[in-house]
Swiss-Prot record:
GO terms for biological process: cellular detoxification of nitrogen compound; establishment of blood-nerve barrier; glutathione metabolic process; nitrobenzene metabolic process; response to estrogen; xenobiotic catabolic process. InterPro entries: Glutathione-S-Trfase_C-like, Glutathione-S-Trfase_C_sf, Glutathione_S-Trfase, Glutathione_S-Trfase_N, GST_C, GST_mu, GST_superfamily, Thioredoxin-like_sf. GO terms for cellular component: cytoplasm; cytosol; extracellular exosome; intercellular bridge; nucleus; sperm fibrous sheath. It is an enzyme of class 2 (transferase). Conjugation of reduced glutathione to a wide number of exogenous and endogenous hydrophobic electrophiles. May govern uptake and detoxification of both endogenous compounds and xenobiotics at the testis and brain blood barriers. There is a cross-link at residues 54, 73 (Glycyl lysine isopeptide (Lys-Gly) (interchain with G-Cter in SUMO2)). Residues 5-92 form the GST N-terminal domain. The gene is GSTM3. This is Glutathione S-transferase Mu 3. Changing residue 120 to F: Strongly increased catalytic activity. It comes from Homo sapiens (Human). Changing residue 213 to F: Strongly increased catalytic activity. Glutathione binds at residues 11-12, 50-54, 63-64, 76-77.
Amino acid sequence: MSCESSMVLGYWDIRGLAHAIRLLLEFTDTSYEEKRYTCGEAPDYDRSQWLDVKFKLDLDFPNLPYLLDGKNKITQSNAILRYIARKHNMCGETEEEKIRVDIIENQVMDFRTQLIRLCYSSDHEKLKPQYLEELPGQLKQFSMFLGKFSWFAGEKLTFVDFLTYDILDQNRIFDPKCLDEFPNLKAFMCRFEALEKIAAYLQSDQFCKMPINNKMAQWGNKPVC
């Protein structure tokens, strides 16, 4: 992350929806700085750090994460990813690649939503067995879609690989053996983590493996750097 910042990424001080964005910014060697907001402790989980400025940033749809790049002010995590990716030709080139990008982008968000609902549910322990029972079927679909390709759009790295890496990693933390039956997914994870800029970031002080979720979550809410 360069000190000569041009972009500003705003989000909670967790991985959450911003991890894939951070990875893409690092991979593309984009100059940026972060504005991290802290959620208060239980029982109130005070969000005033964010709420005090939420409507003062001139955002069309005020929310986290946001990206400020000069006159361009963007919310929605996938819109931010696409904005960065377009600058580096990472949205797919052929029609087939673009179709695969669109499919996996939305499939990942469905997958992420399921995990988020589980992690924030007061019935977390009750619902966890069903999630774990259905997880292999979910992962099998990703494995079959990837097939023998190096990346999820084909043989060229696109922004959806950053999204997919993140959700697979979250599930790998949730259930450490979940990828064992899917060698192509494990190879994808290794391939992604071996990218020079990604490897450097994951080994840096800027990266924290946890918390994935905010403090009111039932899982993934503890800091582990």
